[in-house]
From Swiss-Prot:
HAMAP family: DrpB. GO terms for cellular component: cell division site; plasma membrane. The gene is drpB. It comes from Escherichia coli (strain K12). The chain crosses the membrane at residues 17-37, 65-85. This is Cell division protein DrpB. GO terms for biological process: FtsZ-dependent cytokinesis. InterPro entries: DrpB.
């Protein structure tokens, strides 16, 4: 077997745990996109609360953006964790003992 060849019979496949991790990551990505679109849709319909000066309220524009940022960061962190698990369980070629 030549290293780097791309014959069909040499194609690597994932283990069942790796497939589960990959599908969990794909599902999370879909949910992430849906949740962000839903958040934008819902928050765009809520009127801003009048706030004067440097005080802030969660109903203000700054509060909406802060809530969106915190939600985005949390969901991105979970997505990064699931993505790293899917990456760790990827199929790898068997190591050859070429230099022994």
């Amino acid at each position: 077997m030549e290293y780097g060849s791309t014959k069909m019979e040499e194609r690597l496949s994932r283990s069942p745990g790796g497939k589960l991790a990959l599908w969990a990551f794909y599902t999370w990505c879909g949910y992430f996109v849906w949740a962000m679109a839903r958040y934008i849709w819902v928050m765009s319909r809520i009127p801003d609360a009048p706030v004067s000066g440097f005080e802030s309220d969660l109903g203000s524009t700054a509060g909406k953006w802060l809530g969106a940022l915190v939600g985005f960061l949390f969901m991105a962190l979970v997505g990064a964790l699931l993505g790293s698990i899917a990456w760790y369980t990827r199929p790898r070629p068997a190591r050859s003992r070429r230099y022994e």
